[in-house]
């Protein structure tokens, strides 16, 4: 094998192994066996992930049953990984593999070197120079061994570290250590610098933003905490590339901006994800399918700013690790989280499998099926569905696919350094807002703010800024471009408030926005009541005679959501996050966006080639007139006068391709 790279085929990233284009639909398991590997191989899977780990998982059972390879300082035993690789080679003789290498401090290392355990307290150890060097040496030794012995069968490597292998610094909750204190002084170039005390870091949950008297101190530390982890990933990536020379793909789990709830987004250390997403040394990013969007009546969702990854030619793997109806609820007698609420039967399982596939196919994302502790996919129906999805992906690859989104969503990690991590602000503006976005009936692209100067304004009609609390110069220039283009901007909560206060909000929205005095937990829109358990302070309303009200506070009857049309563009402001699909659809429709579904219970997954529909009940879809084929079933559907009726069936997913005339 000479070189593995990512190649766009008809607009979509694929794995290219010496010119052989392979669909990035893959398999992973903590308990690989001859049966589950060969089942997926026979279904057409060609890419397989192999985990090398002697670590104990969150469930207090081993990640891998094959044993440890990092035995002591500079002492390695590669026999356990060899045995596992040989199983994969035997069970998937035509497969290619990605080795997942766990870099954490082992129990022997913690005892010998007296450092914190990286699996639980990553940020307290990750700056330790000796551990970094020894972990990098282990990483390089494992790669060299694998390449020398099996190089023609490996397409890539994943670097794992931190809680649940996802580079989370979970349990330390930003707490200091001697190692971290030393690194912080060096970061600030200040020998007297101190990590802020816990009572300064843990601020009142009623306040959305950091207190003025501690803001500079806390914001500097939060940035250091996040960059420490991101920069460490890039350190290990550079070390790995010193061996790989970019001839194989390299990946990590990282950047869960939309998923980490509450204070976890700050504590776990993913806010500096842009550095990793844009690094030339990283090729692949992975995350599980969003946990909050897995129910049979939900929509499926990504955890990351997908379109920034795609723009930077990074392959994004969505991990399907849903607990299927066949999955045992426990492993070695220990309940798997969610095991007591697993998918109830094969219909629900196949519905969600197909829905995740439609989400990935519409966006051009990769996907792997995770048979976590074995047996989660042991049914003919499930393997047949996987076989069909692989064949569909191959057929789709022969035709051009591109985004038809007319909505650009912009999110930012760095704009959250100024926010109070206990306020729930990220949940309102980011995590929970995915629900409304998924149900507004139109596709959207989601970018990180680092790409603001590269987004083609002409492609979109509506721009949604979810958390532009502290926009930089690049974002401000982008906003001015939009305002000159005649498009629509939707602002959420407190744009440009963090440094410039109300004056900043008023200038960037071109509206008179005022602080709200009094308690409010409900906003009435034209379509529904938006009810909130907690709205942090400050709260705002619009006091502007030229604004068209779209949402009114229940108690004060002040305008919470409103639109203002100018000669060149339309400004829409919402004082609350987590807008529902109906409200977003109304804003999008007014902006001229093409709407495919006017029913919030029927999400759609759309690109230039197909229209994916997920409907548990009868559905009506807006699409070009003509005959369409559902490629899951080969059933025909007809759209007349731009509308298609889809009766409810046994399965909820329809993947519709218009027949050639």
Language-model features, listed with the residues they occupy:
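A conserved amphipathic helix/loop scaffold
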Residues: 349, 466-661
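Aromatic-lined substrate-binding rim segments of carbohydrate-active enzymes
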Residues: 34-120, 143, 235-243, 470
